[in-house]
Swiss-Prot record:
Underlying gene: secB
SUPFAM superfamilies: SecB-like
Lineage start: Bacteria, Pseudomonadati, Pseudomonadota, Gammaproteobacteria, Alteromonadales
Biological role stated in the UniProt entry: One of the proteins required for the normal export of preproteins out of the cell cytoplasm. It is a molecular chaperone that binds to a subset of precursor proteins, maintaining them in a translocation-competent state. It also specifically binds to its receptor SecA.
Keywords for the protein's UniProt record, in alphabetical order: Chaperone, Cytoplasm, Protein transport, Translocation, Transport
The protein, known as: Protein-export protein SecB
A Gene Ontology term for the protein's cellular component: cytoplasm
Presence of the UniProt keyword rRNA-binding in the record: no
PANTHER family: PROTEIN-EXPORT PROTEIN SECB, PTHR36918
The organism of origin for this protein: Colwellia psychrerythraea (strain 34H / ATCC BAA-681)
HAMAP family: SecB
Localization per record: Cytoplasm
UniProt record, GO biological process: protein folding; protein tetramerization; protein transport
Organism domain of life: Bacteria
Length: 165
């Protein structure tokens, strides 16, 4: 009976979801102030553009690299004040998940984990460029991922309906 419990426990352990952060690191970083020092003389009322992107690569069974790219462009009076680009990456162990849940974890949960690191790097770069304090507002990666899934489903439905006509 003890052997039966051990077999059941080991089977349950094999089937339970697995998630671990192996490493978080800065993959690439760039900061440009193409119009300095003239931009420092302008009235500081910047227009901020934020671009986000994620990509993932399967490294091995249950091991994935997820890269969150954050690009922030500040423009003052039609002049680029600064351009900050950060690629924050992580290596994650993710196992025993259904395909949809795996895609959700890679597309939403991992970027949510990486974002605070990218946010800190961007804030530091902007500060070192001697610009006023800048903090990225939190990003709802769950909502972005849900929109992405819905958009793909719509595109697939359109493609299928055009194939039948």
């Amino acid at each position: 009976m003890a052997e039966e419990n051990q077999v059941e426990n080991s089977e349950a352990a094999q089937q339970s979801p697995e998630f671990a952060i192996q490493r978080i690191y800065t993959k690439d970083v760039s900061f440009e102030t193409p119009n300095s020092p003239a931009v420092f003389q302008l009235d500081w009322k910047p227009e901020i553009q934020l671009d986000l992107d994620t990509r993932s690569t399967k490294l091995a069974d249950n091991t994935y690299e997820v890269v969150l790219s954050v690009t922030v462009t500040a423009t003052v009076e039609d002049k680029t004040a600064f351009l900050a680009e950060v690629q924050q990456a992580g290596i994650f162990t993710i196992g025993n998940l259904p395909e949809a849940q795996l895609a959700h974890t890679i597309g939403a949960f991992c970027p949510t984990t990486l974002f605070p690191y990218a946010r800190e790097t961007v804030a530091s770069l902007v500060n070192r460029g001697s610009f006023p304090q800048f903090n990225l507002t939190p990003v709802n990666f769950e909502g972005l991922y849900a929109s992405y899934v819905q958009q793909r489903a719509t595109q697939e439905n359109v493609a299928q309906s055009s194939e039948t006509h």
